[in-house]
Amino acid sequence: MIDKQQVISDNAAGANDTGSTAVQVALLTARINNLAGHLQTNKKDKAGQRGLQLMNGQRRRLLKYLERTDYDAYIALTDKLGIRRGQRIVR
């Protein structure tokens, strides 16, 4: 089970920060880790596998946005959550 308030307080920039990109990525990461553990024991849960793919895609889009808008926060968040970073695309 995910302790949502704990994840939010660990990644929030301020007291009322519940929807910033960093918080959203942290919550998605917690949900992804929880679902991945479930899928280890329930290998035939196809709906769960699809949900995992959708959450990974959403997290990837949010991380791409964060990388584009605030690169330092992106580096700090990926290090903190243990998420691998892709190569930086300079445009």
Curated annotation (Swiss-Prot):
Entry superkingdom: Bacteria
Gene Ontology MF terms in the entry: rRNA binding; structural constituent of ribosome
The keyword rRNA-binding appears for this protein: yes
Entry keyword set: Ribonucleoprotein, Ribosomal protein, RNA-binding, rRNA-binding
UniProt-listed GO biological process terms: translation
Membrane-crossing residue ranges in chain numbering: none
Pfam assignment, any one: Ribosomal_S15
InterPro entries, per the entry: Ribosomal_uS15, Ribosomal_uS15_bac-type, uS15_NS1_RNA-bd_sf
GO CC annotations, alphabetized: cytosolic small ribosomal subunit
Described function: One of the primary rRNA binding proteins, it binds directly to 16S rRNA where it helps nucleate assembly of the platform of the 30S subunit by binding and bridging several RNA helices of the 16S rRNA. Forms an intersubunit bridge (bridge B4) with the 23S rRNA of the 50S subunit in the ribosome.
PANTHER family linked to this entry: RIBOSOMAL PROTEIN S15, BACTERIAL AND ORGANELLAR, SMALL RIBOSOMAL SUBUNIT PROTEIN US15M
Subunit: Part of the 30S ribosomal subunit. Forms a bridge to the 50S subunit in the 70S ribosome, contacting the 23S rRNA.
Family listed: Belongs to the universal ribosomal protein uS15 family.
Protein name per the record: Small ribosomal subunit protein uS15
Underlying gene: rpsO
